Structure formats: C-alpha cells, structure tokens
C-alpha cells in the first residue's frame, strides 16, 4: 500500500491555504479525489494545484460526468464549478488520439483564458493539448494552431462557429460539450450560434451545463438537446455565505468622496469596482488615480490586447484596484480579491449576484459595498427580495475579521495566464532560431561565421504613464494605510476621455 502512494511524496505541493472557509465548500460527503478513481497523472496535477478535497459541486458532478451522462448543474459562484467539469474532461481525453475531443464554450475571452489555464494546470502531467480561440484575435493564428494537435478547444461562440464552418476545426469526434455560464450562453446574444455549433458535433455527444442561475431558456435547451440529464442544484441560498454585504446611502456628487473614505479605512488586498457604463469606468479610474491610488480599468470597448494585459497584471497582483464594467462579472476567479464595490448599483439581481461573487471565492471571506442614491432605493429592496438576502446599512467601523484573512501569505497567487497567440509566436520564433543556429553551424563548417538568430520584442504592448511625484507625497500626507502606498498607474491603459465629458458635472 505504501508503494502505491509513494508517488505522492514526490509531488511539488504549494503552500497550504490556511484561510477559514464556509459551508459553501466544506459541506461535503467526505469523499476524496482518489475515491473517483482518476488516473494518476490527473491526480498529480490536482494535488500540485493545491486542491485537497472536492467541493460539493465537484463531489456531485465529477463521478457522474465520468460515466458519460449529461449534467445540468446549478451552484454558487466561486465554489469550484470550473474544476467540476475540467477534471472529468481531462479524465476522458485520450492523448494518443489527435482529434478535438472536448469543446468548452464560455461567454468572454477573459473566462476562456482562465479556463484554459485551469486545464493546463490540472492536466500538466496528462499530455493533453488545450487551445483557446476567441473573437478579436488573429484568425490566421488560430488556423495555424489547429494544424497541430488539439485535444480540448476552449472558446467563445462566434469564433468557434467561424472555425467549424470553415472546416478548420474538426468537431466530428468531439464527444464532450461543456457550457459554462449557461444562462448567459443561452441568452438571445448567443443561443442561435450555440444551436449552429451543435450541428457540427456527433449526435451521441455528452453535454455538461454549469451556471449559478437557470432561466427558462436553459430549461428549453435542456428539453431539446440533453438526454435524461442528471440535475444538480446546490442553491439553497443564492449568495455566498462568506460575503458580508452593506449599502451606503450617498448623493451622486458625494460618491467619489465616499469611495476615498472607504479606501482609507478598509484593509484591501485587491478590490474590484463596478460601474454601469464604459464612460463612467474610464472617468472613475482617472479620478481614483488623481486621488493618488494605483488603478487599472477594463471594459468591452477597449482593444483586446489591452484587456488581456489588464486582466493578466491584475491577477498577478501588480495593482490593488480594478474599475470595470460588467465584462468581468462572470467566472473570473481571483482569490486575492476581498472587496467588491458597486459604485453604480446594478439593475438586476442576476448582475448583482455575479458582481459580488468576485469576492469570497471558494468559501473564503469577502466584503461587498453598494453606493446607492435616492433612485436606487426600490431596486435595492427588489434585489433583496429576489435573492432572499439582507443588505445592511454600512456601520461606522467594519470588523476586519469579516473580510481579511489572518495570514495574508496564505492567499494563493494564480498561475500566470499567457496569451495563446503569444505562446504560439514564441514557439515559432524558437523554431526559427534553432533553424538559423543549425544553418550557422553548417556555415562555420563551410568557412563562414554563423549568424545568431534575433527575436524582436513584442510590439504594441500598452505602457504605463509616468507617475507624478505629487501623488506619492499625497499618499503620505493623507496617512493612507501601507497597503495603499504604491505608485498609481494612470488610468490604465492611457487613453483620452471622450470629448466634452466634464468630470465635475458627474461627481
């Protein structure tokens, strides 16, 4: 028996996450990952990623998915849904079969990149090749990469349909179809495209649908396309137990002052601030920068490469504050985020649920603060009723134990997400470099010196603007907490505000 488990002693395990967790992830049947009879290479990746025991959604979904049955799963944000479908996907893939065997569809590029990174992390020993394809990127690069071996295709609906229609992506042997954020995927924006994509898959494929909310459109899709699905519902309550929710009643022109007060009093590890429009995202990011805080921003109107850079740097903790639209409300898992602020109160309960779910990930603690004005009061009551939760008035002092981990070093740093196109370009450059070196060695044998291959730097990457010295002095004069004393990035990426958009009239 000891010989069977000897491989565990050779694993490169990360530092254990000692932060307290809630019943959202602890209320399990007591199973372990070994109980699912997964292949050893997959277990190695699971343990090296820091996974210890399966969460409730993983415990329910993994063994059923491995048997090949369709699944319709509903669970809270931040409880391990991604691993719940990635693990059975990796278990079912046959590395020696050079075909696309699994298709994972997600609504945004950021979520696609994150999902692919989970696949690469958990499947690092499995020999599985994963490719990401999304709109807004070079189609030619995708076509070239599909000439190589791809086992798992992760993408957004439009680009996947484009590649399948061109017969570049061969889905004829794709036996597994996964939809994350199924409620969004089956909205009017994507439903027709999803229906078309399914025509390229074999009829006898397995379908896994995961989401936190299931509207009528999902049920209609289930009746039409799923065969006797196993239904999982772990939503006794909609909001995560580890998130404390407050509202602050302020006039519109006082919101920025209130935000500044929160920055000075809260112990923020990382924070996401949501606005309801792209113009307000950019303007608020500029205002926060003017106050002397480091700040990035992201919204759907930005260039794709800029969004990628923001997402990557924020995940790596290079800045504490991110201002964004609802672009990042779905699926984005950054465990260092412990505070979410709704600078603009959302219009629907669904949006509110996804926004505050960016904190308190995987059963940990988080804080959600809503800045509301007179026009938001009825919406606040409506969302409380729909979600069955209470949003209390913000107290004068917020207990740090509600949202701050005792040991900050226990917060796991995510594995860097590399843009697949940059990875492909780097691989091609390395191949060219090797070819040139080989030619150079042959040339030296023939009597002329070989030339060293030169790899040019990546072009078009957004740069930070210089930091004015007065902002650093302002930090010290205002007595800001140590965690906020850092050089601010000037409204990342540097762009001009819309013409005629006067800040004083809004705040």
Swiss-Prot record:
<dbReference type="GO" id="GO:0042149">
    <property type="term" value="P:cellular response to glucose starvation"/>
</dbReference>
<dbReference type="GO" id="GO:0000290">
    <property type="term" value="P:deadenylation-dependent decapping of nuclear-transcribed mRNA"/>
</dbReference>
<dbReference type="GO" id="GO:0034063">
    <property type="term" value="P:stress granule assembly"/>
</dbReference>
<dbReference type="GO" id="GO:0045900">
    <property type="term" value="P:negative regulation of translational elongation"/>
</dbReference>
<dbReference type="GO" id="GO:0098562">
    <property type="term" value="C:cytoplasmic side of membrane"/>
</dbReference>
<dbReference type="GO" id="GO:0045727">
    <property type="term" value="P:positive regulation of translation"/>
</dbReference>
<dbReference type="GO" id="GO:0036267">
    <property type="term" value="P:invasive filamentous growth"/>
</dbReference>
<dbReference type="InterPro" id="IPR011545">
    <property type="entry name" value="DEAD/DEAH_box_helicase_dom"/>
</dbReference>
<keyword id="KW-0694">RNA-binding</keyword>
<dbReference type="GO" id="GO:0033962">
    <property type="term" value="P:P-body assembly"/>
</dbReference>
<dbReference type="GO" id="GO:0003729">
    <property type="term" value="F:mRNA binding"/>
</dbReference>
<dbReference type="GO" id="GO:0005524">
    <property type="term" value="F:ATP binding"/>
</dbReference>
<dbReference type="InterPro" id="IPR001650">
    <property type="entry name" value="Helicase_C-like"/>
</dbReference>
<comment type="similarity">
    <text>Belongs to the DEAD box helicase family. DDX6/DHH1 subfamily.</text>
</comment>
<feature type="short sequence motif" description="DEAD box">
    <location>
        <begin position="180"/>
        <end position="183"/>
    </location>
</feature>
<dbReference type="GO" id="GO:0010494">
    <property type="term" value="C:cytoplasmic stress granule"/>
</dbReference>
<feature type="domain" description="Helicase C-terminal">
    <location>
        <begin position="242"/>
        <end position="402"/>
    </location>
</feature>
<dbReference type="InterPro" id="IPR014001">
    <property type="entry name" value="Helicase_ATP-bd"/>
</dbReference>
<keyword id="KW-0810">Translation regulation</keyword>
<feature type="compositionally biased region" description="Low complexity">
    <location>
        <begin position="466"/>
        <end position="488"/>
    </location>
</feature>
<keyword id="KW-0378">Hydrolase</keyword>
<comment type="function">
    <text>ATP-dependent RNA helicase involved in mRNA turnover, and more specifically in mRNA decapping. Is involved in G1/S DNA-damage checkpoint recovery, probably through the regulation of the translational status of a subset of mRNAs. May also have a role in translation and mRNA nuclear export.</text>
</comment>
<dbReference type="GO" id="GO:0000932">
    <property type="term" value="C:P-body"/>
</dbReference>
<keyword id="KW-0067">ATP-binding</keyword>
<feature type="compositionally biased region" description="Low complexity">
    <location>
        <begin position="430"/>
        <end position="452"/>
    </location>
</feature>
<dbReference type="GO" id="GO:0003724">
    <property type="term" value="F:RNA helicase activity"/>
</dbReference>
<dbReference type="GO" id="GO:0010603">
    <property type="term" value="P:regulation of cytoplasmic mRNA processing body assembly"/>
</dbReference>
<dbReference type="Pfam" id="PF00271">
    <property type="entry name" value="Helicase_C"/>
</dbReference>
<dbReference type="GO" id="GO:0051028">
    <property type="term" value="P:mRNA transport"/>
</dbReference>
<dbReference type="GO" id="GO:0006397">
    <property type="term" value="P:mRNA processing"/>
</dbReference>
<keyword id="KW-0507">mRNA processing</keyword>
<dbReference type="Pfam" id="PF00270">
    <property type="entry name" value="DEAD"/>
</dbReference>
<dbReference type="InterPro" id="IPR014014">
    <property type="entry name" value="RNA_helicase_DEAD_Q_motif"/>
</dbReference>
<feature type="region of interest" description="Disordered">
    <location>
        <begin position="1"/>
        <end position="26"/>
    </location>
</feature>
<dbReference type="GO" id="GO:0006995">
    <property type="term" value="P:cellular response to nitrogen starvation"/>
</dbReference>
<dbReference type="GO" id="GO:0000749">
    <property type="term" value="P:response to pheromone triggering conjugation with cellular fusion"/>
</dbReference>
<keyword id="KW-0509">mRNA transport</keyword>
<keyword id="KW-0963">Cytoplasm</keyword>
<feature type="binding site">
    <location>
        <begin position="75"/>
        <end position="82"/>
    </location>
    <ligand>
        <name>ATP</name>
    </ligand>
</feature>
<feature type="region of interest" description="Disordered">
    <location>
        <begin position="425"/>
        <end position="507"/>
    </location>
</feature>
<keyword id="KW-0347">Helicase</keyword>
<protein>
    <recommendedName>
        <fullName>ATP-dependent RNA helicase DHH1</fullName>
        <ecNumber>3.6.4.13</ecNumber>
    </recommendedName>
</protein>
């Amino acid at each position: 028996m000891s010989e069977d488990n000897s491989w565990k002693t050779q694993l490169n395990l990360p530092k254990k996450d000692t932060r307290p967790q809630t019943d959202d992830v602890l209320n399990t049947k007591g199973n372990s990952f070994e109980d699912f009879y997964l292949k050893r290479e997959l277990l190695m990746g699971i343990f090296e990623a820091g996974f210890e025991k399966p969460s409730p959604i993983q415990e329910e979904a993994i063994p059923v998915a491995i048997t090949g049955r369709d699944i319709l799963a509903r669970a809270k944000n931040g409880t391990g849904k991604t691993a719940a479908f990635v693990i059975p996907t990796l278990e079912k893939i046959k590395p020696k079969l050079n075909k696309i065997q699994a298709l994972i569809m997600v609504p945004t590029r950021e979520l696609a990149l994150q999902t692919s990174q989970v696949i690469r992390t958990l499947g690092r020993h499995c020999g599985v090749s994963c490719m990401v394809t999304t709109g807004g990127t070079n189609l030619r690069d995708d076509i070239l990469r599909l000439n190589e071996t791809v086992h798992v295709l992760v993408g957004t609906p439009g680009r996947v349909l484009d590649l399948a229609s061109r017969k570049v992506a061969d889905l004829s042997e794709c036996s597994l179809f996964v939809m994350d954020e199924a409620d969004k995927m089956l909205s009017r924006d994507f439903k027709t495209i999803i229906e078309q994509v399914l025509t390229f898959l074999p009829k006898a494929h397995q379908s896994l649908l995961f989401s936190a909310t299931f509207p009528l459109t999902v049920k209609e899709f289930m009746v039409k396309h799923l065969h006797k699905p196993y239904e999982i519902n772990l939503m006794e309550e909609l909001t995560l137990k580890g998130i404390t929710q407050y509202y602050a009643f302020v006039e519109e022109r006082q919101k920025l002052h209130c935000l500044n007060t929160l920055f000075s009093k809260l112990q923020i590890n990382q924070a996401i601030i949501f606005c309801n429009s792209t113009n307000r995202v950019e303007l608020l990011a500029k205002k926060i920068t003017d106050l002397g805080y480091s700040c990035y921003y992201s919204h759907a109107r930005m260039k794709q490469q800029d969004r990628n850079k923001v997402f990557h740097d924020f995940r790596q903790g290079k800045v504490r504050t991110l201002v964004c639209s609802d672009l990042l409300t779905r699926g984005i898992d950054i465990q260092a985020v412990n505070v979410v602020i709704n600078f603009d109160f959302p219009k629907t309960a669904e949006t509110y649920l996804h926004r505050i779910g960016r904190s308190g990930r995987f059963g940990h603690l988080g804080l959600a603060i809503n800045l509301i004005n007179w026009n938001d009061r009825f919406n606040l009551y409506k969302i409380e009723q729909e979600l069955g939760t209470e949003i209390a008035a913000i107290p004068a002092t917020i207990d740090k134990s509600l949202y701050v981990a005792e040991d900050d070093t226990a917060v796991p740093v995510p594995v860097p997400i590399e843009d697949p196109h940059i990875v492909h370009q780097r691989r091609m450059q390395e191949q060219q470099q090797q070819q040139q070196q080989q030619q150079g060695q042959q040339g030296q044998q023939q009597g002329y010196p070989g030339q060293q291959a030169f790899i040019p730097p990546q072009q078009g990457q957004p740069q930070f603007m210089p930091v004015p010295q007065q902002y650093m002095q302002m930090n010290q004069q205002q007595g800001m907490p140590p965690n906020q004393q850092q050089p601010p990035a000037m409204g990342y990426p540097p762009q001009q505000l819309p013409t005629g958009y006067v800040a004083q009239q809004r705040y």
